[in-house]
UniProtKB/Swiss-Prot annotation:
Protein name stated in the entry: Ribonuclease P protein component
HAMAP family, per database record: RNase_P
Assembly and oligomerization: Consists of a catalytic RNA component (M1 or rnpB) and a protein subunit.
GO cellular component: ribonuclease P complex
Keywords: Endonuclease, Hydrolase, Nuclease, RNA-binding, tRNA processing
Organism: Prochlorococcus marinus (strain MIT 9215)
InterPro entries: Ribosomal_Su5_D2-typ_SF, Ribsml_uS5_D2-typ_fold_subgr, RNase_P
Length: 128
């Protein structure tokens, strides 16, 4: 299941902001870049104030897998974990999260991938 639209990060300005203003947490399989949210950067056509919430993006390089099917499978696995554990996320502090997967052969090891993801979520203080 995909992330809801109000939880997705997109746009060059948003990613440039995250790369410049983020705290980086490294793991063996992935890297987290966590930045405080800045709603002024987002282009929203609606006048609602839902842009100051937790948002995330998952970037998976072709170095991880040449097949888009496998990269999308990894993305769906991480998004599914996030949606099932959404209540644990500290929503009182609006953050933007960019997840970059490092290259390696872990496409078949779902448990290792999810364990690393959860450890980095704790390490970055995004979940309690």
């Amino acid at each position: 299941m995909a992330l809801p639209k109000d939880m997705r990060l997109k746009g060059h300005r948003t990613f440039n902001y995250i790369h410049k203003n983020s705290t980086i947490y490294h793991g063996k399989l992935m890297t987290f870049k966590v930045a405080r949210s800045n709603p002024e950067i987002l282009f929203t056509h609606k006048l609602t104030n839902n842009s100051n919430k937790f948002r995330m993006a998952i970037a998976i390089s072709k170095k991880v897998s040449k097949k888009a099917v496998e990269r999308n499978k990894l993305r769906r696995i991480l998004q599914e974990w996030l949606l099932t554990n959404i209540k644990k996320i500290n929503n009182h502090k609006p953050y933007w999260l960019l997840v970059n997967l490092k290259f390696g052969d872990f496409c078949n090891d779902k448990s290792r991938l999810l364990e690393e993801f959860q450890n980095l979520m704790f390490k970055s203080h995004l979940i309690k």
